[in-house]
Amino acid sequence: MKTIRAILNGKKAGNPELRDAIMKMRDRGVDVQVRVTWESQDMPRLVKEAVTDGIERIVVAGGDGTVNEAASALIHIDHESRPELAIIPLGTANDFATANHIPDSIADALTLAVEGQALSVDCVKANDRCFINVAAAGFGAEVTAETPVELKNFLGGGAYTLTGVVKALGFKPYDGSITIEGGRYDGEMLLGAFCNSRLAGGGQQLAPNAMIDDGLMDLTLVRPFLPHELPKVIEEINNPSEKGEFVKHTRASWLEIDFPNPLPLNLDGEPYHSRKIRFEVQPKSLKLVLPKDCPCVTH
């Protein structure tokens, strides 16, 4: 009998569709063992418990925050003992699952979790934290699934709304330095996006070419601009390069940011503030169950 350990976000544990899918999978002879998280320290404890019990595959059911909790817990497990990870997307925003073509149907996602192949993928450490999807800084840290669509449009390419929105909501640029392999950026930043995968903020495409197994982050930095410079900004958003005047795009395996004041940041949607942060890709550090048509792996 095949055994998997399902760890459910407590807010989703009563989902009737999820319960039905688990029961049907058990009827097929799969031993689906269920655990539930209620508090922030539950995930690390339950992951350690699974390792002690010899579980080889963990399935987490929840949103991007739950996936982040699981990845963060797994990265602290010795590599040889680290279970594989599968995902049932149940959040408000399921950006990582969506980008990687993990089914949004609970039954189909559970079937993939049981039958799918695990591939080695990267995660990114940010000081003592980690993320598997996207870290957004500055203005970008405010962009979540609940953000008004006018604000999110900027990250989807509709930058014509940005100037008015920034003025209306009083966003101010952040002044500091960013050091990456082969370069350094000093000055004001409106938005920083450090991407392992492609989507954030409820489906906004931040890094359309990012791969989760290439050992690199896709980085986008946007510096402040004046209203008459907006056409140039839009052009650079649509045609990102390292040489953009306002929008700079590059790839790197590590970067360090140093700001006089703590920079607002979110890691897979989870808030984090720090003045100095080192981001470092952990290549192929997790084994993740993915569909065969996943566009974010090099195959």
Swiss-Prot record:
Compartment(s) of residence: Cytoplasm
Protein name: Probable lipid kinase YegS-like
All residue ranges annotated as the DAGKc domain in the record: 1-130
Keyword Transferase: yes
UniProt source species: Vibrio parahaemolyticus serotype O3:K6 (strain RIMD 2210633)
Keyword vocabulary terms for this entry: ATP-binding, Cytoplasm, Kinase, Lipid biosynthesis, Lipid metabolism, Magnesium, Metal-binding, Nucleotide-binding, Phospholipid biosynthesis, Phospholipid metabolism, Transferase
Cofactor(s) for this UniProt protein: Mg(2+); Ca(2+)
One Gene Ontology MF term: lipid kinase activity
Functional description taken from the UniProt entry: Probably phosphorylates lipids; the in vivo substrate is unknown.
Cofactor note: Binds 1 Mg(2+) ion per subunit. Ca(2+) may be able to substitute.
Coiled-coil region(s): none
Entry binding sites for ATP: 37, 63-69, 92
EC number: 2.7.1.-
